[in-house]
Design a protein with these regions (language model features):
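A glycine-anchored, Pro-Gly-centered beta-turn/N-cap motif
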Residues: 66, 71, 76-79
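Extracellular beta-sheet/turn segments enriched in Thr/Pro/Gly and aliphatic residues
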Residues: 104-140
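Hydrophobic loop/turn residues within beta-sheet-rich immunoglobulin-like superfamily modules
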Residues: 32, 73-75, 127
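A short, amphipathic beta-strand motif
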Residues: 25-32, 41
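Bacterial N-terminal signal peptides
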Residues: 7-17
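Sec/Tat signal peptide C-region and signal peptidase I cleavage site
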Residues: 18-22
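A short tyrosine-centered beta-strand micro-motif
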Residues: 80-84
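Acidic, glycine-anchored loop motifs typical of Ca2+
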Residues: 88-96
């Protein structure tokens, strides 16, 4: 009887340790301006936040004005930050004007930022069934 109870406990523990299935995250960037170049976007975990690489990335060459839709496949449930930039000259770097971006960018809650972003301010949660979000682009004037 003890062996049977331990076996059931082991099966239960293994089933709880199984990672959640990965799903798709669809991001719609609104307010995109036709400025040439490329829109580069990534989903970043807390550990990847504000780094140059992330496990989930996508890009759109020469985006047209309006909305751009990106799909990130195989994203595990959890908290992520969306980082997007409109790299107008496609040099792979965000141009800055002092401390402000000189190219288009987007983050969750980006319009509410009054200083450098933190993961907790710009994160969103990916559910076990996938997630669809819409985020406005911000362009310098």
């Amino acid at each position: 009887m003890l062996f049977k109870t331990l076996s059931l406990a082991a099966v239960a523990a293994l089933s709880l340790a199984t990672p959640a299935l990965a799903e798709d995250v669809t991001v719609t960037l609104t307010g995109v301006e036709a400025r040439g170049g490329v829109i580069v976007a990534s989903l970043q975990t807390r550990g990847e936040f504000m780094q140059t690489s992330a496990a989930h990335a996508d890009r759109v060459e020469r985006p047209a004005a309006g909305s751009v839709r990106l799909t990130f496949r195989g994203v595990a449930p959890g908290d992520y930050a969306l980082m997007a930039m409109h790299d107008e000259d496609a040099d792979g770097r965000m141009k800055m004007n002092g401390y402000m971006p000189a190219e288009g960018w987007a983050m969750i809650n980006g319009d509410a930022l009054r200083g450098p972003p933190t993961f907790d301010l710009v994160k969103f949660t990916v559910s076990a069934t996938g997630t669809d979000i819409s985020v406005p682009m911000t362009y310098p004037r």
